[in-house]
Amino acid sequence: LDPAMRGWMNDTKSYIPPVEINGVMRAGSVGKVIQNNNNPNFQVGDCVSSWGGVQQYCVSDGEGCFKVDEKAASMPTFLSVLGMPGMTAYFGILEVGKIKEGDTVLVSAAAGAVGSIVGQIAKIKGCKVVGIAGGKEKCDYVINELGFDGCVDYKNESIKRGIKRECPDGIDVYFDNVGGEILDAALVFLRMGARIVVCGAISQYNEMSAKGPDNYLSLLVNR
């Protein structure tokens, strides 16, 4: 399951059409070819990744299907670090965020599928990495298992106070997965020339009306 599924249920203008009522829920999938009607690109038994949806079997003309090597990694891996979450994290933080050694990187939803990978990539690149997560268990995971330098527990402390503690010199890159009040808090600590990677807004997915940033001026003065 992916948070994006919630957005795909809304009949609004987006980067992809909504899922039809009574239709198969859109989802990335990994499976094996059990029958092939003369498609030269695949053979019975091939392991493939595709947008097969939430179902046990699907029929495809082969478009959007890609072979994966199940000997190289377990099949679920092609839905995580070697799938959409991994690609989102990789290109988001490197191509959009343009991180460099010494940057301070703040990641919301740091214990999630994308955020957890973003932070590890940033650490490999020599950045100081701080996460934002909800609850002690998630924050411990972010620091002790993923190797982040620090974590703000938005459920049990002031978000702004936590960011100030962990990022006393400000933020060079903010990887935003949630929007809302956490985005508002992060904007206060942007350094001059900071970059924001807008990946998700999960805090807003169930809201009837969208709420914009309260401190938009921070984007102007720290451009």
Predicted regions span which residues?
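Short, well-ordered loop/turn sites that connect or cap secondary structure elements
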Residues: 41-43, 99, 190
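Glycine-rich phosphate-binding loop and adjacent beta-alpha segment
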Residues: 181-223
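Mid-domain Rossmann-like dinucleotide-binding core that forms the NAD(H)/NADP(H) cofactor-binding site
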Residues: 79-157
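Short amphipathic alpha-helix with an adjacent loop that forms part of the alpha/beta core around
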Residues: 158-169
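Short, glycine/polar-rich helix-capping loops at beta-to-alpha or helix-loop-helix junctions
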Residues: 55-56, 134-142, 159, 210-216
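Short helix-loop-beta connector
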Residues: 71-75, 98-104, 168-169
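Glycine-rich beta-strand-centered segment in the early N-terminal region that forms part
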Residues: 1, 7-54
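Loop/turn positions that initiate beta-strands
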Residues: 45-46, 102, 193
